[in-house]
Amino acid sequence: MARHLVIGSGASGVHYALTILERGEEVTLLDVGYERPAAPLPDATYTQLKEQLADPLSDILGERSEYVVYPGPVSKPYGFPPSKSYVFRQPAAWSLTSRGFDPLVSFARGGLAEAWTGGSYELDERDLAAFPFSLGELQPHYATVARRIGIAAERDDLERFSPMTAGYDAPLPLDAHSAQLLGAYARKRQRVNALGVYLGRSRVAVLTKPLGERAECTQLGRCLMGCPRESLYAPSYTLRQLHRFPGFAYVPGVFVERILLDGDGRATGVMTRELAAGAEKRFTGDRVVLAAGALASSRIYLSTLQHENGAAPELPGLMDNRHVMMPFVTPSRVGHDVEIASYQFHHLALGMRGNSAGDDVHGQITALKGAQVHPIVSSLPFDFRTSLSVFGRVRAALGIANFWLADTRRAANVAELRVTDDARHQLVLSYGDDRSDLGRTNQAIAAIRKSLRIIGAIAPKSQTAVLPRGSSVHYAGTLPMTNDERKHTCRADGSVRGFERLIVADGAAFSSLPAKNITFTLMANAVRIAHASQ
């Protein structure tokens, strides 16, 4: 029997496990665990990769051209390449339906952060106002995670929104487009700040110097496909590190169905189903730690109550950041060369301070280098040949600002369980008040569009898209931490009320959802909870 039975190998699970192992205790980690494929030609740039692969069309676009992004009402300029298909592969045992919510889930080794873009921002006291612990209780664990994963950052105007208390590495070199925008901001800061908008360098979990087995970024331009040098952090790298501890056991290929409870409500283990054989298999532990991601952990919790009581409750308070995508063009860069061999994701970030933490806005600005051509070309008002020619001229001038609004727990947004006709447990997600923040959203759109114009970029109104709920991939709030003694909530240490030795270490336990990207905080909070789990 393991001392700690951890479910899930994503950002929360691996950092909880590493903290426990470092103090000499045993951990068994259960996982579906789909694996990342090996990266071909790991030293080649993206351009060299296209030239040297035997079949670049299939290897890069996929055997069925699944990497091609086709035009649609809201077409993102980035798709997920075949090398990332393992991240979104789902076992047959998983079932989900939703209303007003279009989520992504992952059963990969490393979870959804295997496909993240590395944004890593510390929360401030405003962000934690709804949480039952203080910023001072979280900050030491940011330092631990930063030391483990490596984060490139620079002190700038964004420190008013996100502290820099952890140890950070030197920032990545800027691409020319991002450098031009940041330089324009430095000259016109007062005008931009008057709109409530502040710009700075994006803080990214990318190495600018070697760390353990991982190498520093050398600007190969292969970030979208998966960094072959492991410069861009992924939780699967920490999972690999866990295997060095004698007290660690990793069990992939199992789907956790429910938590096992004794007559006193004490968690004693879990019931799983083996993916290969389909047989049920029990695992026991002194405590059970839900770290499968907010949605999967919610399904396990609800399935447990369905089995124990014959019915499962609704879990109100499902949260997801409002996500806005704002393409722009910087006219002075038309005709310039495109820097394909560079870091492909965001180099810049932005912040807006609202009247309360729930009104704050956080964003990241990307100069498009590795974007998909098809959705952009198809939107131009010319024939295809002319559109391609125009795109070639303006490509170096294109960029995109993605920004997010904070979210709060509200009763209309729920997770619940449905037992299907074939006795499967299906997670049902409903986001019932999608219009609650449209006023704040429109204010942010107007301010950010004006700010971009001040620094020389034009963001056409017709191209700005308010994306469907679920697009942010920041899900939280179904089993919130609170000081209130209520059912289906957690204490500050992640322990679930009404049960013993059951812990939630992922976003399901978040009390509110700040605008900032939460992966860094998920890891730091998991470390905090692990320290509290004695």
Task: Describe each model-derived feature in a short phrase.
Residues 89-90, 202, 219-220, 257-260, ...:
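A glycine-rich dinucleotide-binding beta-alpha-beta segment and adjacent secondary-structure elements
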Residues 10-11, 295, 509:
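Residue-level detector of alpha-helix initiation sites
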Residues 22, 26-52, 245, 254, ...:
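Glycine-rich loop(s) and the adjacent beta-strand/alpha-helix scaffold that form part
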Residues 38-40, 153-166, 458-466:
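Short, glycine/acidic-rich hinge or "gate" loops at secondary-structure transitions
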